Regions:
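The conserved beta1-alpha1 loop
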Residues: 10-14, 81, 225
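Active-site loop/oxyanion-hole signature of alpha/beta-hydrolase fold enzymes
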Residues: 38-79, 93-99, 113, 119-125, ...
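Gly/Ala-rich beta-loop-alpha elbow adjacent to hydrolase catalytic centers
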Residues: 80-84, 88
Length: 277
């Protein structure tokens, strides 16, 4: 039986950031009248391993969404940041109906769609096993993963340029949910396995253009990007413009703008989703 008449958002996180990192964003969306459900960590369930082009992660999202749609009685909006945006797009393309309800729309948060020669180059790099030296996986595989306590974790991330602009509560949520106590005394560990993070980077989808030709989206799509996003500039926006039919909005911030400006992100997400209706 339906548990709520509120619109349902299935949110998918960015690589290495468990869904609980986005708690401030989720609370703001709930205050705006949405239900928000999310898989906590992609890539950590052995039933859905990380492989090239992420088919099992897409299936994990499809299975989770179907369950949540059936529980709530509401069709889902698929919203995702970075990795999560790509998974949302592929999931909606392959599964226009989830839980016996048509997907209402896809919203990409700084997930620019790779196509054309860049996708071909990525495919070549993957086949030649060179992708690990050119993707962010070159950094993630050496990422620091243990500290003595929470204060040391907080000091570590506060000193990082990528985290310097984060909302304070979001950073605290990341320390709380993105790390955990180890079995040894004085040990705080990264919760998102850096080997999984690296595997996700090294298996980036090079087939999005072909997938969307075989399975055209049956629902509207939109994109919200960060004005200072390096990732967006690297990938280009040609495919994104085509898929979203120009439904593009920009917010001040980097690729990680949902962590930097969670309240502004929630307002933009609401505007984009209401525009689908």
């Amino acid at each position: 039986m339906p548990s709520s008449s509120k619109p349902l958002i299935i949110f998918s996180h960015g690589n290495s950031f468990p869904a609980s990192t986005y708690g401030v964003l989720f609370q703001s969306l709930k205050a705006r009248g949405f239900q928000v459900k999310a898989i906590e960590k992609f890539g950590h369930d052995p039933r859905y391993p990380v492989t090239s082009n992420w088919p099992h992660l897409v299936q994990q999202l499809a299975d989770f969404t179907s369950q949540e749609v059936e529980k709530s009685g509401q069709p889902a909006f698929l919203v995702g940041h970075s990795l999560g945006g790509f998974l949302s797009l592929m999931c909606a393309a392959r599964n226009p109906v989830l839980g016996s309800q048509a997907v209402r729309g896809v919203l990409l948060l700084d997930s620019p769609i790779l196509g054309g020669w860049r996708a071909t180059a990525l495919n070549v790099a993957k086949r030649a096993q060179l992708v690990g030296s050119v993707s962010p996986g070159a950094i993630s595989r050496r990422r620091k993963f243990q500290w003595q306590n929470r204060d040391e974790v907080l000091a570590h991330f506060r000193s990082k340029k990528a985290f310097a602009r984060w909302d304070e509560q979001v950073l605290l949520d990341y320390i709380e949910h993105g790390t955990h106590d180890g079995t040894a005394p004085d040990q705080r560990l990264l919760s998102f396995d850096r080997d999984v993070e690296t595997a996700i980077y090294n298996t980036l989808p090079d087939n999005l253009e072909a997938l969307l030709k075989r399975h055209p989206l049956k629902c509207p799509a939109a994109f919200i990007g960060g004005c200072q996003s390096v990732e967006m500039k690297q990938v280009g926006m040609a495919m994104t413009q085509k898929v979203t039919k120009g439904r593009i909005m920009m917010l001040d911030g980097s690729h990680l703008f949902p962590m930097e400006k969670p309240e502004a992100t929630a307002a933009a997400v609401e505007a984009a989703l209401r525009n689908f209706c």
